[in-house]
Structure formats: C-alpha cells, structure tokens
C-alpha cells in the first residue's frame, strides 16, 4: 500500500502536480477512482462512517405529518383500537367515583352526621378537581407525552382512594375527593386529546364516539354498581376499595401501552436511526422554566383568548351541568313519586346507556357526512361539518327537558320521564362528541390543551348544578324545577347553529389553530 501511495507522487509519473492534488482531494472525499481502491474505504463504507460521525439533522416541524412512517396513525389498526379501548375503560374507571357518590351520599351523611349540602361537597369538589386538573395535565401531556401523565395521575388517584375509604372526618374526605378529581381528570384530557394521535380526522369520529359512550357508561354504571350500599355486608367504603384494586390493574396496563404523542414517537424513531431532530429542548434550567410556563398557562390562555373555545366552554357550562341536575332529579321522581326501590331508581340510568349506544351506532353515518363535506370542499376538511347532524339532533335537548318536566308525575307512566331524559342524553352526548371532534380538528398540536380549556367551564357548571339542584328541589316542585331549566335550554339549538354557520369566521381570529401553534410549543428554536 505504501508503494502505491508513493507512486502517486513519484516524478516518474506523467501526472501533473494538479492531477496529484485532485487525486489527493478524491482520497479525502472518499471519491477516488478505481486506482485508489485499497487505499481507503469504499464509498458506501465511508458514507456510513460519515453518517456516524455527523448524523443527519432534521427539523421537528418536518416530522409532524401523518405521512411519516413512525406516526401513530400508521400503526396497525388492531394496535390503535386496543389502545383506545383500554383508555376508554380507564375513563369509565375514573368517572366511577363522582357519579357513584350519589348512591352512598346518605350513608356518608349518617357516618359523619352532616347535612346533605356538606356531604355533597365531596361530589362537587371531585367535579371541580376534574375541571382544574386538565388545565395543567393537558398541556403537560402535549409536550411530555401521554404515558407519563397517565401513570403518575392514576397512581395518585389510587392512593387517595385509600384516604376516601378510611377517612377520619368529613374534611379529609372532601379534600381527598378534590385530589381524586384532579388526578382522574387525566383520562378525560388524554383520551379525548389522544384519539387524534392515533386516527386521522376522517376516521376519528367512531373512536371519539366510543369515548363518549365510555363516559356515559361510567356515569350510568356507577349509581347502579354502588347499589351495594343497601347491603350492610359491603357498605359505602367498597366504592373506594374497588377503585384501589382496579387502579393497581391500570397502573400495570399503562406500563405496557406505548406512547402515542406523535412528536415523541417520531423523535425516538429518528434518534434510533441516528438522526438528530432539531427543536427538541435540552434539559437545562431555561428550557425547564419554559416548559413550566407552557404547562401552567396554555390551558388558561386558550380558554380566555380563543373565542371558539370560550364560547363552547360556556355552552357546556350549562349542558354538562344538566347531567348532574338529572342525577339529583332521578330520586325525587322515581324513588319518592313512583315509589321505586333504590335499585329500581338507579336502574333508570340505563336509559342513558341506551341513548349513548344509539349515538355510537350512528357515528359511521356522521363520519360519512363529514367525508362528503370534505369532498365537496375540494378535499379540505371543515371542522364545522362535525355539526351537520347536530342541527337537527340538538332540538331533542329542550324537547326532552319539557317532556320530563311535565310528565314526571302520575297519571303519566314512569316511562314518560325516562323517554324525556333519553332525548336530553342523545342531544347532549351528540353535541359533546361534535365539539370534541371540532376542537381536535382545529387544534391538532394542542389537542390536550384545547380539551382541557373546554372542560374547565363544563366542570365548574357541574359543580354549581350539584348544589343548585339541591336548593331547587328543596324549594320547588320537581315539575317546575326541571321546567325552569327547560326554558333556559331553548337557547341550546341556537348556540349549535352559531358554531355551524359562523365557526369558520370565529376560528379565523385564532393564533393557535392548525400548525400555527407550533411556534408556541416549548421547543428549542422557539
């Protein structure tokens, strides 16, 4: 080899000095001709070595597209649906406590010798915590990943169920319920915000409807399951004991389920391929503070500055609160008026299960309507198209309220108010599903934060209605208490029409819709 190298620079060779320099340059660049074979590595070997020494640098903004092979939307359908199914079960689990508390409330009152309003604080603080939690957990999951937030939250949720099962006084129980609400809220934020991680907008409707069905299933099943309260052998504490056992199961499940946040998944994929992704912040104090600022402010910023989120949140302040209003109305109507047993009155919640199942079965039609609108719009999806069916279904909301109000007593059969409640559940559930799809379509990079900003007014409304309903039913007949809310609900269809016809104009005022939000994420180059 030495003789070959020497011969390249020998005076006896006919090559000029310039040729010698060219060959030397070729040797340096790894592109020498066949006469340099054996002197250095082949091109492919050299290129591989250079890639190892100088990894390819890719900007994160080029990797958020669903066209990337590592994007969770490109995973096998069975894997994606398994993840959604497990997370929907988790939503049923965390909603169990707040919706099941009504069935054990009288036992808690007797245990601590407190009034109904004081005992209801356990429920209302749980609801309030469920509204505040997503304001921090939503943004945190948008930058830190879904999986770590899930695990830590469910761990805290499980621990404080122990505190609720073995409280020394009612104050401890109320505080523990608030913390349970905060920790359990991650299921609502992460599932609703995580579905767009796994499904494109054209097919996200069905998994989102499954999530809504899971919410209804938890709300319906909890009062029925906590009917064990009437059995002295088990008692009210078993609501929390069961939560502790199931919580341990979900902690194991979370360890197995993969991360779904696209930026996290794609970055890991590229790093494994030896590429450097620009824009990922380093772990220094400045970047940590930037992340803390994002986590603590983004949810509130979106709620207060995004017109579409603010208007939808105010709508759901009333609409979601109505569901807790009916939780209270069930007992004076079916237990006191129609003389049903406690279990019989609890079983009336099954009407909501039927209504939610019908919504789930209808969702493929809703998706077809959305795709048809997209085709008519030259392949561009309009989030407002999510409300097409709602233009008609939302009319069931006030109609069902009035039916319940004026037929919730003899001589009308007990089935009549159940039908009215079902009509409200169909309209309310469908509107909620449309809004969740609308928000995740409009804010793909901040879906968790958007859902969180939307849910805070919703849970504040539920907190308020949990106490207002107690006052109304104590001072008014059931008929006029529900009728009062029915007259207010007349405005619901007009609000939905506003979203459909003017939503695009309202979205135009936003600085966070679509990929515009990328510059606000706590990335290194922002």
Swiss-Prot record:
SUPFAM superfamilies: MFS general substrate transporter (SSF103473). One of its GO terms (biological process) is pyridoxal transmembrane transport. Keywords: Membrane, Transmembrane, Transmembrane helix, Transport. The chain crosses the membrane at residues 81-101, 118-138, 147-167, 173-192, 204-224, 238-257, 314-330, 349-366, 387-407, 413-432, 444-461, 480-501. Residues 1-53 are annotated as: Disordered. It is a multi-pass membrane protein. One of its GO terms (cellular component) is plasma membrane. Pfam families: MFS_1. Residues 38-53 have a biased composition (Basic and acidic residues). InterPro entries: MFS (IPR011701), MFS_dom (IPR020846), MFS_trans_sf (IPR036259). The keyword Transmembrane applies. GO terms for molecular function: pyridoxal transmembrane transporter activity; pyridoxamine transmembrane transporter activity; pyridoxine transmembrane transporter activity; thiamine transmembrane transporter activity; transmembrane transporter activity. It is found in: Membrane. Belongs to the major facilitator superfamily. CAR1 family. PANTHER family: MAJOR FACILITATOR SUPERFAMILY (PTHR23502), VITAMIN B6 TRANSPORTER BSU1 (PTHR23502:SF180). This is Vitamin B6 transporter bsu1. It comes from Schizosaccharomyces pombe (strain 972 / ATCC 24843).
